[in-house]
Amino acid sequence: MAKREHAATAALKRAQLFRALAPAALARLALNATALNLPRGKQLCRSGERCPGLYLLVNGRVMLSIGAPRGASKVIELIGPGGHIGLAAAVLGVPETVTAQTLADSSLLLIPCEALLDCAADNPGFALELVAELSRQVCGLISDIEAFSLHSGRERVAGYLLQTAAAGGARPRPVTLPAKKSIIASRLSLTPEYFSRMLHELIAAGAIAVNGRQITVLDPDRLRETSH
């Protein structure tokens, strides 16, 4: 196996989405995949454009957003290593509904739509995993709608910080926000000014400590009370 194909196979094997695939199926996908190395600020795809396939993020960070003709935009999701972009559009064969842009130098694999769907047709377990992943995305969007519609901005900030801290482990230790505070604010449907004000209030309450993009949850119980 060529070095490039070996690296692609290893990247696919690490991603949760492809865990149901046997080595031979992974190797076939890797053979059809294209490796991309993109600088920070590069667009992968734009809303309304044809979807060439599924992007698997190997390293880096990607922002998914929607925009209005007047220039306003809303961050939908931040994708980290092991995540993917374009699954729904690739499966349905429809144009992209979001714009994807790298927030850091990023390495990705592009799996063409035809190769992805052929793999699903040949591997029922993988097809079920695609259905499960699309279902998780729907549940996530419903949770977002609930938060944006029924939770205060303060509750959204507290909930996000608890979720971020939980990903960093049980002990209180600094965790780094995955993007600039203005981008996090947009993800939570808040203005940057409001997001900063909520951070200062939580600092004053002794719930968190902030050092740039590093945040330490000092009092999880107090933060949980704020998130409900």
Task: Describe each PLM feature range.
Residues 17, 42-104:
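Cyclic nucleotide-binding regulatory domains
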Residues 20, 78, 110, 178, ...:
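Short aromatic/basic micro-patch
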Residues 65, 87-88, 118-119, 160, ...:
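Residues that scaffold the ATP/ADP-binding catalytic core of kinase and kinase-like folds
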Residues 77-139, 143:
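Cyclic-nucleotide recognition modules
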Residues 103-105, 121-192:
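Polybasic "coupling" helices that flank or enter modular domains
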Residues 162-228:
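Phosphate-/nucleic-acid-contacting segments
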